[in-house]
């Protein structure tokens, strides 16, 4: 199997973007393509048809490649959960909790074996693997235990592209410094450099590019302009880079930025609505009176609920509800809307319980079993009979303590979602719910009607179709601005 790899001089250099765009580009050229990231540390996860967890970014890359996401594309997923620990997921299944030091001792060999086995399976079905690195390949203190960057590139003899973010400054120093810190056999794999996120006239870079090529003896494949093309990101640092307020927005929705926020990709479809402003709010900020508030998922629900209470945000949310505000909780957010969360076995952390917001009649117990599965259901609210697809990822069971004044959101399963009779408090376990176009628009119309705004059409496509357009635009950007002949030559 032939291989390409994207590594970056820093985090957020554009590796995920470039990997997804390359997957779509080669898919359009008729290749059977698969993405691959040996080890990913992220709280944005996706659940495959088989019930396995993988990084959401690799799922997007799989769709870019025109194939179905599978756990072999991301055999190791580390999900940080506070106190310097992470949950370890290998081949889609949680196998333990570890610190960074213990991970190298206890999981390194198992992880490398999982990577090799996954690549063997993928090589039997695909012509080309497009790999993504993590962080920087030149972290001297981490290289001996790096399962994601040049170890994989050497194993596959991958044509490797080094991508650098010029928008943050210091791009030439980042490139030269990274190359200087690579071993000779690693540096020999670097077949091209991509300068990413450039604002301005490209000719201003010409002299610098000439110098860089002369000094490194590696071609600069091109300069990608700073683009407003939006692709799901891997971690919450990227929330700082979200697009500015939209001039035509009529609704304002707040997402509470929990300390351990997870699966905030749930809100990408809302960000894609031209009439909706989505703002991520820190716990110390003033809530105000938005049209809706969303409490997202969390990897450590009990700790984040305690933070919600201690910061005063819980009081703000309860006051907002008393004023008639709409609150929607997803997964951990649903659990926080209840009366109590119990973690007596300390599966999430040292805290054994936390009082909820008491806005839904639920009690949640954190359990040993982790539920990961895809779901297809029909809605009861905000309109009956709408098809809804999504997936569950939670380590807790919620029980209704009263049904009076509350309804089930979905026809098939009362435990999947709940809403009060006034349709002001919503909660569900379904990640990806806003990906469903008709359901999303119908829920937004509920908010619009409360503002006296006209309803928008609900017969719209699901978010996956909008994502397809985005992926094609990303591939078009590569075709317009990059010369990939040095990469093709290696293949």
Curated annotation (Swiss-Prot):
Catalytic residues identified in the record: 331 (nucleophile), 431
Keyword Plastid: no
Domain GATase cobBQ-type: 250-439
Pathway(s) where this gene product acts: Cofactor biosynthesis; adenosylcobalamin biosynthesis
Keywords for the protein's UniProt record, in alphabetical order: Cobalamin biosynthesis, Glutamine amidotransferase
UniProt-listed CDD domains: CobQ_N, GATase1_CobQ
GO BP: cobalamin biosynthetic process
Highest rank taxon of the organism: Bacteria
Task of the protein: Catalyzes amidations at positions B, D, E, and G on adenosylcobyrinic A,C-diamide. NH(2) groups are provided by glutamine, and one molecule of ATP is hydrogenolyzed for each amidation.
Similarity section: Belongs to the CobB/CobQ family. CobQ subfamily.
Protein name (database record): Cobyric acid synthase
Protein species of origin: Microcystis aeruginosa (strain NIES-843 / IAM M-2473)
């Amino acid at each position: 199997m032939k291989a390409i790899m994207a590594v970056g001089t820093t985090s957020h250099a554009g590796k995920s973007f470039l990997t997804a765009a390359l997957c779509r580009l080669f898919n359009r050229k008729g290749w059977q393509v698969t993405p691959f990231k040996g080890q990913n540390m992220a709280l944005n996860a996706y659940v495959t048809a088989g019930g396995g967890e993988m990084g959401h970014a690799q799922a997007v890359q799989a769709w870019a490649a025109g194939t179905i996401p599978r756990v072999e594309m991301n055999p190791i997923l580390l999900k940080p959960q506070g106190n310097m620990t992470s949950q370890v997921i290998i081949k889609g299944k949680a196998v333990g909790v570890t610190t960074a030091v213990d991970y190298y001792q206890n999981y390194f060999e198992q992880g490398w074996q999982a990577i090799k086995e996954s690549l063997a399976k993928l090589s039997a079905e695909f012509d080309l693997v497009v790999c993504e690195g993590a962080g920087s390949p030149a972290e001297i203190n981490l290289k001996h235990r790096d399962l994601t960057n040049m170890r994989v590139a050497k194993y596959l003899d991958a044509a490797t592209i080094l991508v650098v973010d010029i928008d943050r400054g210091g791009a030439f120093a980042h490139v030269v410094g990274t190359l200087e810190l690579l071993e000779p056999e690693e540096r020999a794999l670097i077949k091209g450099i991509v300068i990413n996120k450039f604002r301005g006239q490209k000719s201003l870079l010409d002299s610098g590019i000439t110098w860089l090529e002369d000094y490194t003896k590696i071609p600069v494949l091109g300069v990608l302009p700073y683009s407003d093309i939006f692709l799901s990101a891997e971690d919450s640092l990227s929330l700082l880079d979200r697009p500015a307020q939209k001039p035509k927005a009529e609704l304002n929705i707040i997402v509470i930025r929990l300390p351990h926020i997870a699966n905030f990709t749930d809100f990408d479809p809302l960000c894609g609505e031209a009439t909706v402003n989505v703002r991520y709010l820190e716990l110390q900020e003033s809530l105000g009176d938005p049209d809706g508030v969303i409490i997202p998922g969390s990897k450590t629900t009990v700790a984040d609920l305690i933070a919600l209470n201690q910061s005063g945000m819980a009081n703000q949310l309860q006051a907002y509800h008393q004023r008639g505000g709409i609150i929607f909780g997803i997964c951990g957010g649903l659990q926080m809307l209840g009366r109590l969360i119990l973690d007596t076995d300390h599966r999430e952390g040292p805290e054994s319980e936390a009082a909820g917001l008491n806005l839904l009649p639920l009690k949640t117990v954190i359990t040993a079993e982790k539920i990961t599965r895809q779901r297809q259901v029909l809605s009861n609210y905000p309109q009956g009979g709408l098809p809804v697809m999504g997936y569950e990822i939670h380590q807790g069971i919620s029980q209704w303590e009263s049904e009076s004044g509350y309804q089930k959101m979905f026809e098939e399963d009362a435990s999947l979602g709940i809403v009060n009779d006034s349709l002001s408090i919503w909660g569900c376990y379904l990640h990806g719910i806003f990906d469903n176009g008709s359901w999303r628009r119908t829920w937004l119309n509920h908010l619009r009607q409360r503002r006296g705004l006209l309803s928008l059409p609900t017969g719209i496509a699901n978010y996956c179709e909008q994502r397809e357009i985005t992926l094609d635009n990303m591939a078009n950007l590569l075709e317009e601005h990059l010369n990939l002949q040095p990469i093709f030559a290696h293949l």
